[in-house]
From Swiss-Prot:
One of its GO terms (biological process) is adenine biosynthetic process. It is found in: Cytoplasm. Its EC number is 6.3.3.1. The keyword GTP-binding does not apply. The lineage of its organism: Bacteria, Bacillati, Bacillota, Bacilli, Bacillales. It catalyses: 2-formamido-N(1)-(5-O-phospho-beta-D-ribosyl)acetamidine + ATP = 5-amino-1-(5-phospho-beta-D-ribosyl)imidazole + ADP + phosphate + H(+). Pathway: Purine metabolism; IMP biosynthesis via de novo pathway; 5-amino-1-(5-phospho-D-ribosyl)imidazole from N(2)-formyl-N(1)-(5-phospho-D-ribosyl)glycinamide: step 2/2. Keywords: ATP-binding, Cytoplasm, Ligase, Nucleotide-binding, Purine biosynthesis. This is Phosphoribosylformylglycinamidine cyclo-ligase.
Amino acid sequence: MSVRYEQAGVNLEAGYEAVSRMKRHVARTMRPEVMTGLGSFGAMIDLGSMNMKHPILVSGTDGVGTKLKLAFALDQHDTIGIDCVAMCVNDCLVHGAEPLYFLDYIATGKAEPAKLERIVAGVAEGCVQAGCALVGGETAEMPGMYPDGEYDIAGFAVGVVEKEDLLDGSTIQDGDVVLGLASSGVHSNGFSLVRHIVEAQGLHYTDEIAMLDTTLGNALLLPTRIYAEAAKAAISTGKVQGMAHITGGGFYENVPRMLPGGLGITFDASSWPSLPVFDWLEQVGNISKQEMFNVFNMGIGYMITVRAEDVELVEAALERVGETAHRIGKVESRPGIRISGVDQ
């Protein structure tokens, strides 16, 4: 033990204990392509063992934003890692990639082994859901950088897809149908607005909310869905033209990212069930419907675009993995995102 280092605020023994606690969770995530164990300077992946003709790597990086503030307030850290994995992996999925591996970065003012284990257990659970290996990460203890009990988390995901199967939305055309997959709730975006509403109303995250049938904190901390199994099922049909992950910026910012120039989509907001958490935020926060769709996912976390004649085939593939797809929109030969009942 370095006494002077500990006097400076860094407890090496706590860091070692945290890593030791993490190992059993990391072990759950391993894939046969992984060549190194936890603790190696760099993680190595054997792409050759996948026998692909022309593999394309697809990467994504993200964090969880101010949703962390809720985890701090409620001392609930078990699912925030799932959020981190979801935010990165879902972005890779839209290009047709199979998630391969994930790395995390956790920064805190003081290493607390039990808390760090809970966070990484969530990361590992997210990796299991996504089918990717947690091959490494960094836990940085930085005295003076964060308030007591707080931390930040970010992640980095890499997936792989055959070049000929790469999805970039370029084949989407007028008349295509957009299928929407349900979100679990707010996911990991818009929490600065959520927190503003809660604080302005003088509410607490432990308050029971009748409309939500649970506490406010429980409803808001539901982890972001990981759409790996659904995306794989849809892609297996060979009929997917493009996909989108609905994150910060809601419908208006994320949907255009999958569309070729000159095309737009008209959505029917009545074509999927409304989630109580969004109804509550809209009412209590006095937020316009248009702004809600510009900030939140509004109950749709992932979109899949297919030809009209292929809708039933893709729906059936999704149903086989327990996923219900909603026919929520149609591609049109005029730019822009339009939502019936919202845009006037």
